[in-house]
Amino acid sequence: MFNLLLVVVGGGIGAGIRHLTNMGALRLVGPNYPWGTMAINIVGSFAMGLFIAILARRGGSNEVRLFVATGIFGGFTTFSAFSLDFATLWERGATLPAFGYALASVIGAIIALFLGLWLARSLP
């Protein structure tokens, strides 16, 4: 139960940072392109890589990993988890599965979003 609490609290922090980042991007560059989301995905992926590498080198508790990686970075951007999964497959030498994962995740998510839009718009 404590581990879940760590993820929930970290996720709330990450989501709050994501919201503030998006609002800042809207004020700076306007709403015509998703600059905030793109920045969040890139920065979150960089931060995840940095954190995981430091954790692997110096060691760290599962609780710290859950709070920071799953919680904060997961709340900030799930793209960081996606990027870490891709990198893990790649570093294991599973190149084809890594690209299959990336392709299926991105295309599958976009198709699922359009299906959700279609379904919601079809409801009376």
Swiss-Prot record:
Keywords: Cell inner membrane, Cell membrane, Ion channel, Ion transport, Membrane, Metal-binding, Sodium, Transmembrane, Transmembrane helix, Transport
Compartments where located: Cell inner membrane
Activity regulation remarks: Na(+) is not transported, but it plays an essential structural role and its presence is essential for fluoride channel function.
Cell membrane listed as a keyword: yes
Pfam families named among the record's database cross-references: CRCB
GO cellular component, one term: plasma membrane
Mode of membrane association: Multi-pass membrane protein
Transmembrane segments: 1-21, 35-55, 66-86, 99-119
Catalytic activity, as annotated: fluoride(in) = fluoride(out)
GO biological process, one term: cellular detoxification of fluoride
Residues that hold Na(+) according to the record: 74, 77
GO molecular function list: fluoride channel activity; metal ion binding
Keyword Cell inner membrane appears in the UniProt entry: yes
Biological role stated in the UniProt entry: Fluoride-specific ion channel. Important for reducing fluoride concentration in the cell, thus reducing its toxicity.
Family named by the database record: Belongs to the fluoride channel Fluc/FEX (TC 1.A.43) family.
HAMAP family the UniProt entry points to: FluC (MF_00454)
Identification of the protein by name: Fluoride-specific ion channel FluC
Species the sequence originates in: Mesorhizobium japonicum (strain LMG 29417 / CECT 9101 / MAFF 303099)
